[in-house]
């Protein structure tokens, strides 16, 4: 089994491509969804409130605002949540060893040094204009958080340079499908 990490800048199309791969029958893991599931655990919520006493009650939007405005709080939360995320990722890989490929979307893959858990990395990219257009359509969009995420993340060009493969999501669906088909063919040569 090959483990493929998918990364990219905010609103670059990572989740769209992960969902496309899932619809095609590939096993997929989404770090953001995993963290949302972890956050539902009352014990974990209590631990986070102790870790971040600035929060009066557990609220994901308040956590986002805090961690994108306070580097120390962000680091504390990452140091707490990343080991749990790694455990879930390792379990996902163990449960799917009978598949040729598994795909995992990890937005901060390089920044959090998650690349060590993957055989190959694919960076999804598109223009800044397209990313902004996509971002503003999200219910949770906040321009300040968007800019802070851009500041925290490696540049799109750096992610492309580090990756084994890159997919331009700023194209029509037919072209995108061609790129994904080419990726799968390239990966099949590696099995």
Swiss-Prot record:
List, in alphabetical order, the Gene Ontology terms for molecular function in this entry: ATP binding; dephospho-CoA kinase activity
Instruction: Identify the residues that bind ATP.
Output: 11-16
- GO cellular component term of the entry, any: cytoplasm
Which InterPro entries does this UniProt record tie to the protein?
Answer: Depp_CoAkinase, P-loop_NTPase
- Which pathway is recorded for this entry? Cofactor biosynthesis; coenzyme A biosynthesis; CoA from (R)-pantothenate: step 5/5
Primary residence: cytoplasm
Which keywords label this protein?
Answer: ATP-binding, Coenzyme A biosynthesis, Cytoplasm, Kinase, Nucleotide-binding, Transferase
Domain of life, per the record? Bacteria
**Cell compartment(s), UniProt:** Cytoplasm
Which residues belong to any copy of the DPCK domain?
A: 3-191
GO BP terms: namely: coenzyme A biosynthetic process
Reactions catalysed: 3'-dephospho-CoA + ATP = ADP + CoA + H(+)
Q: What is its EC number?
A: 2.7.1.24
Biological role: Catalyzes the phosphorylation of the 3'-hydroxyl group of dephosphocoenzyme A to form coenzyme A.
The text of the family note is: Belongs to the CoaE family.
NCBIfam families assigned to the protein according to its UniProt record, in alphabetical order: dephospho-CoA kinase
Write down what this protein is called. Answer: Dephospho-CoA kinase
**What organism is this sequence from?**
Rickettsia typhi (strain ATCC VR-144 / Wilmington)
| Gene this protein is translated from | coaE
């Amino acid at each position: 089994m090959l483990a493929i990490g998918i990364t990219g800048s905010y609103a670059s199309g990572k989740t769209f491509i992960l969902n496309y791969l899932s619809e095609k029958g590939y096993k997929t893991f989404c770090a953001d969804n995993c963290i949302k599931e972890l956050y539902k655990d009352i014990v974990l919520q209590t631990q986070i409130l102790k870790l971040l006493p600035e929060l009066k009650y557990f609220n994901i939007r308040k956590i986002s605002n805090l961690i994108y405005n306070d580097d120390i709080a962000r680091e504390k939360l990452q140091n707490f949540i990343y080991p749990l995320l790694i455990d879930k990722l390792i379990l996902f890989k163990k449960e799917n060893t009978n598949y040729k490929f598994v795909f995992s979307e990890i937005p901060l893959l390089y920044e959090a040094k998650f690349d060590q858990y993957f055989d190959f990395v694919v960076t999804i990219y598109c223009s800044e204009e397209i990313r902004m257009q996509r971002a503003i359509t999200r219910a949770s969009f906040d321009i300040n958080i968007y800019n802070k995420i851009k500041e925290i993340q490696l540049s799109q060009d750096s992610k492309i340079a580090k990756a084994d493969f890159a997919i331009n999501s700023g194209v029509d669906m037919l072209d995108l499908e061609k790129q994904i088909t080419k990726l799968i063919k390239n990966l099949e040569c590696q099995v």
